[in-house]
Regions:
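Conserved amphipathic alpha-helix within the SDR
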Residues: 1-6
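Substrate-binding pocket helix/loop in short-chain dehydrogenase/reductase
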Residues: 22-23, 30-32
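C-terminal helical subdomain
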Residues: 112-113, 120, 131-176
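Residue(s) in the substrate-gating loop at a strand-loop-helix junction
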Residues: 72
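Alpha-helical segment proximal to the catalytic Tyr-Lys
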Residues: 51, 101-104
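Active-site helix of classical SDR
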Residues: 46, 88
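Active-site loop immediately N-terminal to the catalytic Tyr-X3-Lys motif
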Residues: 24, 77-83, 141
Length: 176
């Protein structure tokens, strides 16, 4: 991409896997999959992109670069049967704030967007009671569309250089 466009100004880390269930008797391979995608994927992508973002922040026309990490409301509020998913999203939030403090003086803005329920395939990887729980939530709530999240990202990365959105919650209006 850098060869094609010449620079990297914005990184959006938006990969995620949500496998729900009780901790007792859990399939630890599912935990490893979630940690690999939700945490390690974000870390490795950020590590690869950061030198390019730091360079872009020094140059015209924007003189700023952005990292937006997509987390979840599950990175702020824990629920039964969400344990490892909660762990990964709390981790994303902590990493985001730490990185923000490291690179903000170098004009790389780092923020986290924490959506509530969104119409994606995220819940489809579950089965049984957990799938029923997710389906019931979707049926009872007017959940967000992907465009709502894209609009939030656009808002974060189009602020003037002097303004940084460190955290943005985007929730369905009727999600408690």
């Amino acid at each position: 991409m850098i060869d094609q466009f010449g620079r990297l100004d914005v990184l959006v880390n938006n990969a995620g896997l949500m496998l729900l269930g009780p901790i007792v008797g859990a399939d630890v391979e599912e935990w490893e999959r979630m940690l690999s995608i939700n945490v390690q994927g974000l870390l490795y992508t950020t590590n690869a992109a950061l030198p390019h973002l730091l360079k872009a922040a020094e140059d015209d026309p924007r003189q700023v670069a952005d990292i937006v990490n997509i987390s979840s409301i599950a990175g702020r509020v824990a629920w039964a049967n969400y344990g490892v998913y909660n762990l990964t999203k709390f981790g994303v939030n902590g990493f985001t704030e730490s990185l923000r403090q490291e690179v903000t003086k170098r004009r790389v803005r780092v923020g986290v967007l924490e959506p509530g329920g969104v119409a994606t395939e995220l819940g489809t990887h579950n089965s049984g009671a957990m799938r029923e729980h997710i389906d019931a939530f979707v049926e009872s709530t007017e959940i967000l569309e992907a465009q709502d999240i894209a609009d939030g990202i656009a808002f974060m990365v189009t602020r003037p250089r002097r303004a940084s959105i460190a955290e943005l919650w985007v929730m369905p209006t009727d999600q408690a």
